[in-house]
């Protein structure tokens, strides 16, 4: 199963997210320290980083950038209770707090789903010469 790294300065949020995702079979790592999150991402494969945007030690968008520098295959989901302009500017997937377990799990599944191949339209059938 996929490994998800949850980073939030609020321990209660990390606990809730961990509980929601482990119930669905995900392996969840967590930390409140963005620097530790970067170290964790370099030490083992992390499929998805879920990070709060507004944290005192480092913004979530900066953490996402730095994790993807050391682990380019790691996908990112930003979360925040605030409307932050840099969320939109980042172009990264986002889920607003508070969220339901179903909303979080659905968002995680969407992000981790393998890409679907581009469906090319069938060429038109040639018309027989009349």
Where are these regions (language model features)?
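Two-component/phosphorelay signaling modules centered on CheY-like receiver
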Residues: 11-29
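Acidic catalytic/metal-coordinating carboxylates
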Residues: 32-36, 59-63
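Conserved phosphotransfer cores of two-component systems
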Residues: 42-44, 66-74, 83-87
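Active-site residues of response regulator receiver
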Residues: 52
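Receiver (REC) domain active-site loop signature in two-component systems and cognate sites
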Residues: 55
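C-terminal output helix
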Residues: 99-112, 116
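CheY-like receiver
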Residues: 115-130
